[in-house]
């Protein structure tokens, strides 16, 4: 269940702010709960944020319009990096905020 997964692997949240054309307005913000409070985690979150930024900036306008597809791809990017570094699969929540 999600509760057990969160208990054993933690939770990672990403907040992405886009304009109505899909351009990033600010740097993606990542926070974790119950994974690691180490410098390694801080560096990992920064690195993942940069990867998300690079990925979104490489998309065309129509690819950034579908929030569900974008969330799934970003979730895969996050999980891949966290699994490599920490050998866990946290619950990942992605919030996409659109600003006019």
What are these regions (language model features)?
Residues 1-100:
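Acidic/His-rich, metal-assisted hydrolase cores and their charged scaffolds
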């Amino acid at each position: 269940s999600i509760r057990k997964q969160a208990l054993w692997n933690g939770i990672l949240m990403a907040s992405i702010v886009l304009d109505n054309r899909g351009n990033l307005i600010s740097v993606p913000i990542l926070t974790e709960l119950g994974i690691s409070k180490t410098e390694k985690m801080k560096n990992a979150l920064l690195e993942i944020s940069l990867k998300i930024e690079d990925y979104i900036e490489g998309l065309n306008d129509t690819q950034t319009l579908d929030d569900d597809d974008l969330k799934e791809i970003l979730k895969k990017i996050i999980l891949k990096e966290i699994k490599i570094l920490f050998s866990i699969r946290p619950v990942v929540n992605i919030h996409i905020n659109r600003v006019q």
